[in-house]
Structures are given as C-alpha cells and as structure tokens.
Amino acid sequence: GYFVIFMMDGIDDMPSENEPVYITGVGTEDDGDEAEAQQMLRQNEGIYQTFTQLKADQPFIFMSTVEGRKCYYYVDDNGVLRERNDGEDYTVTVPQSGIYRITINMGEQTISYDEIGAVYLFNKSGDYRQNFNYLGYGKWGVKNYTARKQTESWAGSGETRHSFKMEINGTTYRWGHKEKDKGQPNLTTDNSYYNLYQLALGTDPWDYSFRFCDELLQWGEKQGNVYYATVKTDVTLYFNAEFGTYTHRWVASETNED
C-alpha cells in the first residue's frame, strides 16, 4: 500500500532574525522604489509589524532577502499570507487610503490591518492634548512645542505625568511607560525610558505615564496655574524599526537659538 502526505502550502523562505522584512510598492510611501522601502519591526519569530500610509487600490508587497535570495510575500484571495513563486506578480491592496498598522505572522500565514486616526500627547492634568502630525515612515511628531504642566493640590510645582494617545479602529488607546510609576528622567537617563507600550483599555489614566525632563524643558514662571517650558522642543514618536522598538524622543528645537 501507499499513503499520501498532504501539506499546507506554507512559507518556505522564513527570514531569520538578521534578515529584515520590508513593505514596498506603488501603494506605499516609497512609491515603488525598493531602495526606499520601510522596514517592519520584528516583534517575534515570524511576526512583523509596521505603521505606514497606504494608497487605495495601489499594489504593495512584503519583501526580504533570505540567504541571499530576494523573496516576496503577498496575501491571496482567502486572506492567507503566501510567498510568491518565481515569475508570479501577485500583490496586495487596501480599498481605502489611510494610515494603517499592519501585522503579519509568517508562521500562521496571517495578516491584520488596523486603521490609525488621531495621535496626540495627553496630560491627564487639565485634560490637555497636543495633536501630532504624521511625518511619514511610521513617525508622528510636533515641532517647536512649548510643553506645559498644571498645578494640582498634590503637585504645587506642576504635574508632569503624560502619555500618548492613538485612535486605533476608532477606539482610543494610550501608549505609556513600561512601569506603573516611574520617576522623572534627566538629560543622562537611558533612552529606554522613552520606549512606548500600548496599555490595556481601562488602565488608570495616571498610571504607566512618562514624566517631563525638567533639565531639558527649563520651566518658566507660573502663569495662573500653568508652567510653560522656556525651551521649545521637537517631540517625535517612532512607530517604526528605527530603534528596534517603539519609542519617542524629545530634543531642543533649533528655533531656540533665535
């Protein structure tokens, strides 16, 4: 007798840890120039994520170089992530232009899309928000920003706790610190302090917050119940692979020298 082994058409060329995966194509921010392709953040073995802007009905593809060979990955009509064979030109499209968070799982051959709306800095104190602009390639930011902190009964010198908010599929999520109640940073604090973690819905709005760096911002005199920074800053959120993790940075704006 004989038996037949049926195998699912899996992905043969799985990129290793040091073989980056990119999103590229006319539908992406690189306009089809693979040299400008956006690298995805590797979250785990076979799992990659990117925040990026896509154009409706324009093709894109996932790409990696595995053991020296250029490999492309697409999504078939059943929503299954597959590897393109030589000579094939399958691509992927989305029906609506927008900014998306895309997650692919090569082991399970799945893809998910989340639509991203407003992104902003949020101070629970005073319920103050500062909207951020999308800068491209998974970055959001604001330039020449004057930080503010408001006095509270428990914080006479101003409450510096803040986090970042992001609308994902119409629901607002907070991104905050890894620790529930982390102290204030200074100019020599390790950059890992600024790494961003998506918090569960319903998390206490004060917990897992960042705190302002007084050494950088140089607070002025109190005006009413608010202190304003005398040093303007450029604040950038990196929802990309640039630092190997989602993170953010505050730097003094060039305009301060005027």
Task: Describe these PLM feature segments.
Residues 1-258:
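Insoluble glucan recognition modules
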